[in-house]
Amino acid sequence: MHIVKIGGSLTYDAKPLLKALKNYAKENNKKIVIIPGGGEFANVVRKIDKALNISNSLSHKLAIKCMDLIGEVYAEIGYIKAYDTLFDLKREIEKEKIAILLPSKILLSTDIAEHSWAITSDSLSLYIGKLLDVREVIIATDVDGIYDKFPGGKLLNIINANDIKGLTSVDETFPILLKQFKMNAYVVNGRHPERVMDILEGKHNIYTKIVGIDKI
């Protein structure tokens, strides 16, 4: 099983990637779970939080629900079914090979993540990966990967989670959880579906692999 988290930054550009993932899953008999980011909906929550100083718990709850909203959008434009429980997802993915997970029910009922803006949908996708016993997560976003500095830096092909320090396209908690869960991740530009397909195939392309173990 593969997990592909499609960030909210790709909301308006996600359709080709969704189509490519759906075709790949069916043609290769591979199971793919898509986890949505919070997108512009989450940005509205941030704005309200900043203006009204609402509690961390409420911000956390609302931001997670935003992932469901983007997930519903991806489900419609990608013609992919969406589910809000692991039971339904696991059952249906055996037939469909691909599904979108609307994660709020799972994440809020288990309350497994810290209530903080330090944890975004990137890190939440790792929690889902742990629940599904998946060892790798693909983070499809609007940048080519992780750079050694920004702006004007060099794209890194591979990096240890221990070495990620600021100015990255993943949240600050992501490398910590990656090490804790002993997982690997790929950061890739989702506007180029062929790059995501190459990760699924184990082929080299333009992306960054983040290794969540002590040594690469």
Swiss-Prot record:
Binding of ATP, residues: K5, I6, G7, G8, S9, G39, D142, Y147, D148, K149, F150, P151, G152, G166
CDD domains assigned: AAK_UC
Family annotation (InterPro entries): AceGlu_kinase-like_sf, Asp/Glu/Uridylate_kinase, Furan-3-ylmethyl_P_kinase, MfnE
Superkingdom: Archaea
pH-linked activity: Optimum pH is 7.0.
Regulation of activity: Inhibited by EDTA.
Keyword annotations of the record: ATP-binding, Kinase, Magnesium, Nucleotide-binding, Transferase
Enzyme class: transferase
Annotated pathway: Cofactor biosynthesis; methanofuran biosynthesis
GO MF term set: ATP binding; kinase activity
Catalytic activity line of the entry: [5-(aminomethyl)-3-furyl]methyl phosphate + ATP = [5-(aminomethyl)furan-3-yl]methyl diphosphate + ADP
Names of required cofactors: Mg(2+)
EC code(s) of this entry: 2.7.4.31
Oligomeric and partner information: Homotrimer.
Family membership: Belongs to the MfnE family.
Function: Catalyzes the formation of 5-(aminomethyl)-3-furanmethanol diphosphate (F1-PP) from 5-(aminomethyl)-3-furanmethanol phosphate (F1-P) and ATP. In vitro, can also act as an adenylate kinase that catalyzes the transfer of a phosphoryl group from ATP to AMP, generating two molecules of ADP.
Protein name per Swiss-Prot or TrEMBL: [5-(aminomethyl)furan-3-yl]methyl phosphate kinase
Organism in which the protein naturally occurs: Methanocaldococcus jannaschii (strain ATCC 43067 / DSM 2661 / JAL-1 / JCM 10045 / NBRC 100440)
